Amino acid sequence: MKFTVIIPARYASSRLPGKPLLDINGYPMIQYVWQKAQQAGANRVIIATDHPQIQTVAKAFGAEVCMTSDQHQSGTERLAEVVAKMAIADQEIIVNVQGDEPLIPPIIVQQVATNLDKNGVNMATLAVKLTTREELFNPNVVKTVINDKGMALYFSRAAVPFARDHFSECDDTFVASQCYLRHIGIYAYRAGFIKQYVAWQPTVLEQLESLEQLRALWYGEQIHVELAKQAPALGVDTAQDLARVRQMLSQTV
């Protein structure tokens, strides 16, 4: 099975400007992400960016780069521009790896591509079991609810499903014993589906939750969710996250 990884790397960030270029123990964050994608066995890894400085840095460490607009509202829109510019065939499997995930395990990059390939859907993703109350009620931790076939029913920043009769006892033990899932922000799609996705109008749900995958559910598409073979650390959204990642990576050297 062949697949292409595209890494959206947007320069602007309200909390961490220039995030893809932030130094982690001597290397830019985007280089760690690119290396993980290479280790996953992708036949092609493309960094999609809107900023010439990211392009220069990425090319310096050997990455293939596609310059994109700075007007995109989501990573998927950036992917669509890459697919069009590079004339990627509609049946090609595209894996979207976020540019702020320097600790993403290569095994799950490969897993999400396989998930798409074997389940006959246009979009696939991964999740891990939630184990703490803190995660459940953290709006930065996206939750997903699935059916018995692993198809996503919904994604939310809220604590879903809501334990109506057990709220007062909703401690870590209770959370770990239930069907709560933390969504991992990695996706696989067919290139042709990415074109369809961006042709749809944005929806009220994706705008309320600020979750682009809800657009696919709104328009009736199925998203297959598989339990990840390895739980990744959270990505880098804040200065505190960056400090944590620096510490974790310094311990692996």
Curated annotation (Swiss-Prot):
Pathway: Nucleotide-sugar biosynthesis; CMP-3-deoxy-D-manno-octulosonate biosynthesis; CMP-3-deoxy-D-manno-octulosonate from 3-deoxy-D-manno-octulosonate and CTP: step 1/1; Bacterial outer membrane biogenesis; lipopolysaccharide biosynthesis. It is found in: Cytoplasm. It holds the Pfam family CTP_transf_3. Signal peptide: none annotated. It catalyses: 3-deoxy-alpha-D-manno-oct-2-ulosonate + CTP = CMP-3-deoxy-beta-D-manno-octulosonate + diphosphate. One of its GO terms (biological process) is lipopolysaccharide biosynthetic process. It is an enzyme of class 2 (transferase). The keyword Phosphoprotein does not apply. Its main location: cytoplasm. One of its GO terms (molecular function) is 3-deoxy-manno-octulosonate cytidylyltransferase activity. One of its GO terms (cellular component) is cytosol. Keywords: Cytoplasm, Lipopolysaccharide biosynthesis, Nucleotidyltransferase, Transferase. InterPro entries: Cytidylyl_trans, KdsB, Nucleotide-diphossugar_trans. Its EC number is 2.7.7.38. NCBIfam families: kdsB, PRK05450.1-3, PRK05450.1-5, PRK13368.1. Belongs to the KdsB family. Activates KDO (a required 8-carbon sugar) for incorporation into bacterial lipopolysaccharide in Gram-negative bacteria. This is 3-deoxy-manno-octulosonate cytidylyltransferase.
